[in-house]
């Protein structure tokens, strides 16, 4: 099949002169190319197993955005969104073009977003066949041949074998993820990690969509039989994937969505799931994808003889990943869309053990907790001492939020008020004490709480206001002991509870100082208060 003229001319404009171009190859051909080029190996059942070392995760310190007049005052510059200048970008572009000369390239024309009113046409250019398959898994694939009228709104050039030189290229390492919004171009080099491709486009959508009144969200989403839609925000380890995977509800998507005036829609055509320690019992749907032709298993160890994957083996990394089309998961949406959310759930893992397991939020509280993006983790276990550490990631996705967080929070506030959306804080972390003393809230109890939210039960029960965090706690949840609902009552030492609550309140207050001048009085007053803590 001859290469379309619009692709040839675009490659020329990008200064790319490859030996050959493989355009929009489908899975079987990409498998052949990847295996012929020794880019991976087959696992039992059909997945393609690849390696990304030394980078087995994103490299946020190597991500830069070109700072020019058109975007300078619209981007939240800092450690997350590091600026670079156009001369540096253009120099890197030239060096990468030299690297690509005479090599084979793979091109995929796809879309980011299922809603045709807001979708972004993307062109993904890679030097690895498996990266082309990754892109085809993760983005929205065309129903038929790509029309000659296809014009990419953004282009990713991923030349993973190119290694940047920090002295010459203005980088911090051999890896480079450079974004030029004005030229609609992303350059990725020096890293084989597939997630850089998908997250670079997600960052672009986080810049572009607010201007169209669309709230980009780092969340999962599902839909009930009656068309009711729920959105789940949550950082790693909070249970976002587990709790949104419900056999009685249709999965819209597991990671990236937009909320427009038409409702919720998935940005992606696939999933990029963590694979460490999964079993048919713990994650049956996700485990099933590991036996499918077309799935990519990143950094998963396989038996050299049987080629059976060992998902418990973290020899390379704990961040083993699987990339697969969304339809490999049973009961997924056929059009990637849902209505306006009836419920928004913020999931947090509170290692302090002081947040209630479920509580309803006012719109102002929802904006406060959205801006905070709180979860917690255990800092260490030295000498048997486990100290919880508060972690905040604004909008539950700080690494990908290009604009000021208040832009996204204001959009969220507008939408939940306009559509009368109920918002909830669900703590999937500790109860009865902090990490090392208490225990994790039982998954069955958390599922019962989520079920009661989604079926409307919690909207009708009496509430009690938590005096510390100001949250509205349901007095009853079917299937959950009443004693579990009020965290102070689960502690053997109430004074110890108060002390840990003080620590978390202080952490919230310190973190929110960043946003105090950017939000109204109502949102500022929606956080926890030390004055109400007993003792």
From Swiss-Prot:
It is found in: Cytoplasm. The keyword Lyase applies. Substrate binds at residues 58, 193, 199, 321. One of its GO terms (molecular function) is metal ion binding. Keywords: ATP-binding, Cytoplasm, Decarboxylase, Gluconeogenesis, Lyase, Manganese, Metal-binding, Nucleotide-binding. Its cofactor is Mn(2+). Its EC number is 4.1.1.49. ATP binds at residues 199, 218, 234-242, 283, 321, 440-441, 446. CDD domains: PEPCK_ATP. GO terms for biological process: gluconeogenesis. One of its GO terms (cellular component) is cytosol. Pathway: Carbohydrate biosynthesis; gluconeogenesis. InterPro entries: PEP_carboxykinase_ATP, PEP_carboxykinase_C, PEP_carboxykinase_N, PEPCK_ATP_CS. It catalyses: oxaloacetate + ATP = phosphoenolpyruvate + ADP + CO2. Mn(2+) binds at residues 199, 218, 255. Binds 1 Mn(2+) ion per subunit. SUPFAM superfamilies: PEP carboxykinase N-terminal domain (SSF68923), PEP carboxykinase-like (SSF53795). Its main location: cytoplasm. It is an enzyme of class 4 (lyase). Belongs to the phosphoenolpyruvate carboxykinase (ATP) family. PANTHER family: PHOSPHOENOLPYRUVATE CARBOXYKINASE (ATP) (PTHR30031:SF0), PHOSPHOENOLPYRUVATE CARBOXYKINASE ATP (PTHR30031). Involved in the gluconeogenesis. Catalyzes the conversion of oxaloacetate (OAA) to phosphoenolpyruvate (PEP) through direct phosphoryl transfer between the nucleoside triphosphate and OAA. This is Phosphoenolpyruvate carboxykinase (ATP) 1. It comes from Salinibacter ruber (strain DSM 13855 / M31). The gene is pckA1.
């Amino acid at each position: 099949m001859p290469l379309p003229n619009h692709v040839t001319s675009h490659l020329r404009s990008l200064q790319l002169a490859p030996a050959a171009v493989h355009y929009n190859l489908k899975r079987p051909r990409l498998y052949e190319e990847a295996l012929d080029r020794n880019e991976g190996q087959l696992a039992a059942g059909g997945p393609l197993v690849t390696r990304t070392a030394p980078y087995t995760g994103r490299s946020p310190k190597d991500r830069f955005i070109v700072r020019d007049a058109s975007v300078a005052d619209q981007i939240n510059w800092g450690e997350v969104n590091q600026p670079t200048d156009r001369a540096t970008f253009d120099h890197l572009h030239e060096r990468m073009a030299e690297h690509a000369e005479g090599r084979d390239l793979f091109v995929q024309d796809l879309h980011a977003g299922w809603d045709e009113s807001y979708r972004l046409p993307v062109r993904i250019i890679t030097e690895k066949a498996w990266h082309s398959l990754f892109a085809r898994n993760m983005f929205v694939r065309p129903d038929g041949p790509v029309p000659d009228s296809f014009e990419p709104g953004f282009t990713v050039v991923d030349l993973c074998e190119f290694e940047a030189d920090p002295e010459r290229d203005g980088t911090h390492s051999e890896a480079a993820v450079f974004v030029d919004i004005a030229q609609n171009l992303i350059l990725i080099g020096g890293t084989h990690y597939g997630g850089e491709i998908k997250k670079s486009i997600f960052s672009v959508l986080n810049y572009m969509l607010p201007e169209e009144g669309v709230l980009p969200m780092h969340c999962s989403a599902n839909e009930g039989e009656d068309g009711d839609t729920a959105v789940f925000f949550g950082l790693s380890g909070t249970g976002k994937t587990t709790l949104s995977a419900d056999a009685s509800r249709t999965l819209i998507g597991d990671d990236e969505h937009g909320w427009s005036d038409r409702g919720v829609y998935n940005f992606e055509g696939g999933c990029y799931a963590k694979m460490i320690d999964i079993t048919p019992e713990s994650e049956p749907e996700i485990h099933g994808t590991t036996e499918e032709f077309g799935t990519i298993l990143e950094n998963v160890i396989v038996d050299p003889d049987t080629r059976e994957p060992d998902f418990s083996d973290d020899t390379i990394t704990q961040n083993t990943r699987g990339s697969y089309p969304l339809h490999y998961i049973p009961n997924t949406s056929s059009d990637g869309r849902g209505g306006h959310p009836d419920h928004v759930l913020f999931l947090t893992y509170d290692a302090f053990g002081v947040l209630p397991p479920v509580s309803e939020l006012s719109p102002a509280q929802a904006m406060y907790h959205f801006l905070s993006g709180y979860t917690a983790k255990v800092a260490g276990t030295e000498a048997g001492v486990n100290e919880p550490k508060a972690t905040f990631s604004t909008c539950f996705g700080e690494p990908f939020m290009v604009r000021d967080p208040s832009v996204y929070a204001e959009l969220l506030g507008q939408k939940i008020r306009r559509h009368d959306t109920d918002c909830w804080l669900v703590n999937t972390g500790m109860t009865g004490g902090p990490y090392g003393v208490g225990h994790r809230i039982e998954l069955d109890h958390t599922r019962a709480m989520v079920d009661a939210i989604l079926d409307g039960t919690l909207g009708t029960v009496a509430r009690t206001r938590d005096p510390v965090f100001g949250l509205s706690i349901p007095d009853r949840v079917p299937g959950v002991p009443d004693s579990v609902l009020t965290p102070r009552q689960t502690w053997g030492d109430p004074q110890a509870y108060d002390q840990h609550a003080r620590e978390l309140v202080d952490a919230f207050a310190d973190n929110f100082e960043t946003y105090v001048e950017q939000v109204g009085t109502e949102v500022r007053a929606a956080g926890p208060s030390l004055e109400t803590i007993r003792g």
